[in-house]
Regions:
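Membrane-embedded transport module
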Residues: 1-122
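Interfacial loop-to-helix junctions that mark the boundaries of transmembrane helices
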Residues: 10, 91-98, 129-130, 161-168
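Cytoplasmic-side transmembrane-helix entry/capping segments in multi-pass membrane proteins
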Residues: 45-46, 126-136, 197
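Small-residue-rich segments of transmembrane alpha-helices in multi-pass membrane proteins
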Residues: 49-57, 133-143
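Hydrophobic alpha-helical transmembrane segments in multi-pass integral membrane proteins
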Residues: 58-71, 141-157
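Alpha-helical membrane-embedded segments
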Residues: 110, 168-186
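Membrane-interface capping segments at transmembrane-helix boundaries
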Residues: 119-122, 183-199
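Extracellular/periplasmic helix-loop-helix junctions in multi-pass membrane proteins
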Residues: 150-170
Length: 205
């Protein structure tokens, strides 16, 4: 949803970085690290309801707030105080920094999924069984460091990202923490399965 709403909250270059860090690299390494042996199986519907939909719906809804919330408070006074030409010049910079805030949120959320895929401790159990495998968690930490390095170097301009102000960074980080606890609650309580009347799998954790 972040690709298709309003004034394009995230552009292609920003989206490519988000996808690389949260999908491209993790998918390859998780496939390499996959352990042979018994894995419980769920139908596609069960898997969508339990894992995919809660994470994506919450990320989409909170992401809308991450982008449009600050945008509203920044643009409202600018409309009243600036001429049309000044407003257009200001608008470009405001959009870019809010796109960067949303990109940060999506990266953090995507990386927070990795410990849930292979829970290293009981706290992370919700989307899958306890595995005790710390490699995906350390991968998330490493990719988070890569993202920080991008934001602190000229690579930031290559991906069309703006430096985040402290309020923007705090808002994006706080929103990611909100997503973390809400999605964990949704997984553990199986809220979507209950809403749609789907019985839990006997093989589920």
């Amino acid at each position: 949803s972040a690709w298709s709403i309003g004034v394009f909250p995230i552009d292609v270059r920003q989206g490519s970085l988000v996808t690389l860090l949260t999908v491209g690299i993790p998918v390859i390494l998780l496939a390499i690290w996959a352990r042979p042996g018994y894995r419980y199986h769920q139908t596609l519907v069960r898997r969508l309801l339990h894992f995919v939909l809660p994470a994506s719906i919450l990320a989409s809804l909170i992401g809308l707030g991450v982008f449009y919330g600050p945008l509203f408070f920044q643009l409202t006074p600018a409309v009243k105080a600036l001429s049309a030409e000044e407003f257009l010049a200001e608008f470009v910079g405001i959009i870019r920094i809010n796109q960067s805030g949303l990109s940060a949120f999506l990266v953090v959320v995507g990386l927070l999924l990795l410990p849930f895929v292979e829970p290293p401790t009981a706290w992370w159990v919700g989307a899958d069984r306890l595995s005790g495998d710390w490699r995906p968690t350390w991968l998330a930490v490493g990719l988070g460091c890569v993202y920080i390095a991008v934001m602190l170097t000229p690579l930031r301009d290559f991906f069309d990202l703006a430096p985040l102000t402290l309020p923007h960074a705090a808002f994006a980080g706080g929103s990611a923490l909100l997503w973390l606890f809400l999605v964990r609650l949704a997984w553990r309580r199986r809220l979507l399965e209950r809403f749609f009347g789907v019985e839990p799998s006997t093989d589920a954790q």
